[in-house]
Amino acid sequence: MVEAFCATWKLTNSQNFDEYMKALGVGFATRQVGNVTKPTVIISQEGDKVVIRTLSTFKNTEISFQLGEEFDETTADDRNCKSVVSLDGDKLVHIQKWDGKETNFVREIKDGKMVMTLTFGDVVAVRHYEKA
Protein backbone atom coordinates (compact mmCIF):
# COMPACT_ATOMS: atom_id res chain seq x y z
CA MET A 1 0.00 0.00 0.00
CA VAL A 2 2.95 2.35 0.55
CA GLU A 3 3.36 2.27 -3.24
CA ALA A 4 0.55 4.83 -3.58
CA PHE A 5 2.83 7.37 -1.86
CA CYS A 6 5.95 6.53 -3.89
CA ALA A 7 6.47 9.57 -6.10
CA THR A 8 8.04 13.01 -6.19
CA TRP A 9 5.74 15.55 -4.55
CA LYS A 10 5.91 19.36 -4.64
CA LEU A 11 4.27 21.48 -1.93
CA THR A 12 1.50 23.62 -3.43
CA ASN A 13 -0.44 24.91 -0.43
CA SER A 14 -0.08 25.12 3.33
CA GLN A 15 -2.54 26.08 6.07
CA ASN A 16 -1.65 26.98 9.67
CA PHE A 17 1.96 25.82 9.29
CA ASP A 18 3.38 28.86 11.13
CA GLU A 19 1.14 28.15 14.14
CA TYR A 20 2.22 24.50 14.07
CA MET A 21 5.92 25.43 14.01
CA LYS A 22 5.34 28.00 16.78
CA ALA A 23 3.67 25.32 18.95
CA LEU A 24 6.72 23.07 18.41
CA GLY A 25 8.96 25.88 19.67
CA VAL A 26 10.61 26.64 16.32
CA GLY A 27 12.35 30.04 16.42
CA PHE A 28 11.14 33.08 14.48
CA ALA A 29 13.86 33.09 11.80
CA THR A 30 13.47 29.37 11.07
CA ARG A 31 9.67 29.77 10.92
CA GLN A 32 10.02 32.62 8.40
CA VAL A 33 12.13 30.40 6.15
CA GLY A 34 9.82 27.42 6.72
CA ASN A 35 6.80 29.45 5.69
CA VAL A 36 8.21 30.48 2.31
CA THR A 37 10.02 27.24 1.46
CA LYS A 38 8.20 24.94 -0.96
CA PRO A 39 9.89 21.58 -0.42
CA THR A 40 9.96 18.64 -2.77
CA VAL A 41 9.27 15.33 -1.04
CA ILE A 42 10.47 12.12 -2.67
CA ILE A 43 8.99 8.92 -1.24
CA SER A 44 10.43 5.62 -2.42
CA GLN A 45 10.68 2.01 -1.39
CA GLU A 46 14.14 0.44 -1.35
CA GLY A 47 13.94 -3.22 -0.46
CA ASP A 48 12.14 -3.53 2.88
CA LYS A 49 12.73 0.14 3.73
CA VAL A 50 10.75 3.25 2.94
CA VAL A 51 12.81 6.37 2.21
CA ILE A 52 11.46 9.92 2.51
CA ARG A 53 13.72 12.66 1.17
CA THR A 54 12.71 16.27 1.71
CA LEU A 55 14.58 18.75 -0.48
CA SER A 56 14.44 22.53 -0.20
CA THR A 57 16.58 25.62 -0.43
CA PHE A 58 16.55 25.69 3.41
CA LYS A 59 17.62 22.15 4.28
CA ASN A 60 17.60 18.63 2.91
CA THR A 61 16.60 15.71 5.11
CA GLU A 62 16.34 11.99 4.55
CA ILE A 63 14.83 9.25 6.68
CA SER A 64 14.94 5.54 5.97
CA PHE A 65 12.85 3.13 8.00
CA GLN A 66 10.88 -0.08 8.13
CA LEU A 67 7.15 0.35 8.64
CA GLY A 68 6.15 -0.12 12.27
CA GLU A 69 9.73 -0.05 13.63
CA GLU A 70 11.06 2.78 15.79
CA PHE A 71 14.02 4.76 14.43
CA ASP A 72 16.05 7.84 15.37
CA GLU A 73 15.21 10.98 13.40
CA THR A 74 16.74 14.45 13.36
CA THR A 75 14.17 16.89 12.02
CA ALA A 76 14.71 19.93 9.79
CA ASP A 77 14.45 22.10 12.93
CA ASP A 78 17.07 19.90 14.67
CA ARG A 79 14.83 18.01 17.09
CA ASN A 80 16.15 14.52 17.92
CA CYS A 81 13.13 12.22 17.90
CA LYS A 82 12.19 8.60 18.27
CA SER A 83 9.89 8.05 15.32
CA VAL A 84 7.60 5.33 13.98
CA VAL A 85 5.88 5.32 10.60
CA SER A 86 3.10 2.84 9.90
CA LEU A 87 0.23 2.24 7.52
CA ASP A 88 -3.26 2.71 8.93
CA GLY A 89 -5.58 1.65 6.15
CA ASP A 90 -4.72 3.97 3.26
CA LYS A 91 -2.94 6.50 5.49
CA LEU A 92 0.78 6.77 6.20
CA VAL A 93 1.05 7.77 9.89
CA HIS A 94 4.32 9.25 11.18
CA ILE A 95 4.71 9.77 14.96
CA GLN A 96 7.65 11.70 16.43
CA LYS A 97 8.43 11.67 20.18
CA TRP A 98 10.99 13.86 21.97
CA ASP A 99 11.39 15.38 25.44
CA GLY A 100 8.04 13.98 26.60
CA LYS A 101 6.26 15.53 23.59
CA GLU A 102 4.62 13.95 20.56
CA THR A 103 3.54 15.12 17.13
CA ASN A 104 2.11 13.18 14.23
CA PHE A 105 1.79 13.56 10.49
CA VAL A 106 -0.87 11.72 8.53
CA ARG A 107 -0.27 11.48 4.80
CA GLU A 108 -3.08 10.40 2.51
CA ILE A 109 -3.76 10.45 -1.20
CA LYS A 110 -6.86 12.38 -2.27
CA ASP A 111 -7.70 12.86 -5.95
CA GLY A 112 -4.12 12.01 -6.96
CA LYS A 113 -2.66 14.57 -4.54
CA MET A 114 -0.94 14.00 -1.22
CA VAL A 115 -2.48 15.72 1.80
CA MET A 116 -0.36 15.86 4.95
CA THR A 117 -2.08 16.72 8.23
CA LEU A 118 0.32 17.68 11.05
CA THR A 119 -0.95 17.66 14.64
CA PHE A 120 0.75 18.82 17.83
CA GLY A 121 -1.60 19.08 20.81
CA ASP A 122 -4.59 21.06 19.60
CA VAL A 123 -2.71 22.73 16.73
CA VAL A 124 -3.36 21.28 13.27
CA ALA A 125 -1.68 22.26 10.00
CA VAL A 126 -2.45 20.89 6.54
CA ARG A 127 -0.02 20.79 3.62
CA HIS A 128 -1.03 19.89 0.07
CA TYR A 129 1.33 18.32 -2.46
CA GLU A 130 0.99 17.54 -6.16
CA LYS A 131 3.09 15.12 -8.16
CA ALA A 132 6.10 16.90 -9.63
Curated annotation (Swiss-Prot):
State the compartments where it is located. Cytoplasm
What residues bear N-acetylvaline in this entry?
Answer: V2
A single GO CC term for this protein reads:
cytosol
- InterPro entries listed in its UniProt record: Calycin, Fatty_acid-bd, ILBP, Lipocln_cytosolic_FA-bd_dom
A single GO molecular-function term is: fatty acid binding
Q: What is written about domains in the entry's comments?
A: Forms a beta-barrel structure that accommodates the hydrophobic ligand in its interior.
Q: What is this protein called?
A: Fatty acid-binding protein, brain
Q: Which organism is it from?
A: Homo sapiens (Human)
